[in-house]
């Protein structure tokens, strides 16, 4: 008996407080799981432990779903904007989170890094969610923009789905 290898993709939209994650079957182009990952409650005080907790959870999900490909959104350099994020150190914290997640590459066949502009161009989050709303509501009952249930999907989860959609279908 020949067993076909599964091609599974984890798409990730990180932030310093939580992150959006989606897992796909690349062969069938089906979304298998979407989730908002929070740090474990006892990890909320230390930024580094918080990042490690989220990264560890991604590793567990990748084992459960036998993920062998990842695509991770990484921050862009803010030449003009982003003063508040720069002053509070948020960008450095986000880079730390991304670095921990990127280390998953050693257990993956591929690990792609994308910038926000790289996968959605200049498109605002709301426009991206509106573009995907009908398809993802019909297939998975995911309310990307809040029009079907008045409860909008978390932006990190929405972006994780968008990143995976971009990787699998080539555009948003």
Where on the chain are the PLM-derived regions?
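Phosphate- and other anionic-substrate recognition elements at nucleic-acid/protein interfaces
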Residues: 1-172
